[in-house]
């Protein structure tokens, strides 16, 4: 059994921002076409587990899972999976569903990545640790810590 785990399909340029997290819809479609063209049987994850226990799993079986539940999953991945007739399992980040909010650290990192600003001065808010950030990742980590300290 091969379990293929995906995250999100880009709505815009997210595949450039985090290529390990987002791919283009075309890349996802190409992968599904490859699976179909090669004749790999695609089974749902529950069916795969059941068939493993019963020693009845088809040879070269593939299960497809998608993590996080980004909008691109609904817009691009779900229709492509339906078109190919492939079952899949979606794992939702339930914390963010319950809070009805974005995955803050990823959203913030994307905004910083898209920004053309070279420096951000938060000294008026009493925070100076952004000035010492040596990289974008350090700046995002610092901003997340600031935001988390403001949660009430």
Task: Report the location of each language-model feature.
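Membrane-embedded segments
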Residues: 61, 65, 71-77
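Structural preference for beta-strand elements that scaffold enzyme active sites
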Residues: 3, 61-63, 87-89
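A short alpha/beta connector and helix-capping loop motif
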Residues: 76-94
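"…centered on the first transmembrane helix and the immediately adjacent amphipathic helix/loop
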Residues: 1-21
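C-terminal domain-boundary segment and adjacent tail
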Residues: 20-56
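Short, solvent-exposed loop/turn segments at secondary-structure junctions
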Residues: 8-12, 48-50, 69-71, 95-98
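Conserved, mostly hydrophobic/aromatic
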Residues: 4, 35, 67, 81, ...
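Extended, charge-rich helix/loop segments that form flexible
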Residues: 1, 100-152
């Amino acid at each position: 059994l091969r379990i293929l785990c995906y995250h999100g399909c880009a709505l815009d340029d997210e595949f450039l921002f985090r290529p390990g997290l987002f791919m283009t819809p075309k890349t996802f479609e190409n992968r599904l076409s490859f699976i179909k063209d090669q004749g790999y049987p695609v089974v749902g994850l529950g069916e795969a587990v059941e068939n493993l226990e019963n020693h009845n799993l088809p040879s070269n079986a593939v299960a497809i899972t998608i993590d996080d539940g980004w909008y691109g999953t609904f817009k691009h991945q779900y229709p492509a999976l339906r078109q190919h007739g492939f079952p899949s399992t979606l794992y939702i980040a339930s914390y963010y569903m319950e809070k009805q909010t974005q995955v803050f650290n990823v959203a913030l990192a994307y905004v910083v990545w898209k920004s053309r600003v070279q420096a951000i001065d938060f000294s008026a808010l009493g925070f100076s640790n952004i000035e010492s950030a040596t990289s974008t990742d350090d700046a995002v980590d610092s901003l997340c810590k600031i935001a988390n300290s403001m949660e009430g």
